[in-house]
Amino acid sequence: MAKEVAGKLRLQIRGGAANPSPPVGPALGSKGVNIMEFCKQFNAKTQDRIGKLLPVVVTYYVDKSFDFVIKNPPVAVQLLEIVKLKSGSAEPNRKKIAEITWEQVKAIAEYKMADLNCFSVEKAIQMVIGTAKSMGIHVKRDFSEKQLNS
């Protein structure tokens, strides 16, 4: 028999850096989840991704137990890593702060495909381009129609 789900909680935590202080502690503690056990398990599972911002979906049950799923870093974080900046443009429509190539966009889309709510790489690429535009990052489009479909 399956456990009865009490709820789900979404957090963004740096890999290997979960601790009981805010925002993790209060968010989990108010739901009755064992904070120290979560921190130990999360830090153990994210040893290979230390320092990266990781979205986590915590499912907590009526019996105070929990499960969690670690997703890939957000597209915005990956874009900022590629262009080596700390934040996007304050005026993305007027001021472009960086430029990325089509190959980099495609690589991010393929990497994030499992976490995005789309079924084709082309749609995932459009989502990545939209995120880049909203951050003031220009996508260099030096490709033919043949490359678009490959």
UniProtKB/Swiss-Prot annotation:
CDD domains: Ribosomal_L11 (cd00349). It comes from the Bacteria. Transmembrane segments: none annotated. GO terms for biological process: translation. Keywords: Methylation, Ribonucleoprotein, Ribosomal protein, RNA-binding, rRNA-binding. GO terms for cellular component: cytosolic large ribosomal subunit. NCBIfam families: L11_bact. PANTHER family: 60S RIBOSOMAL PROTEIN L12 (PTHR11661), LARGE RIBOSOMAL SUBUNIT PROTEIN UL11M (PTHR11661:SF1). This is Large ribosomal subunit protein uL11. It comes from Azobacteroides pseudotrichonymphae genomovar. CFP2. The gene is rplK.
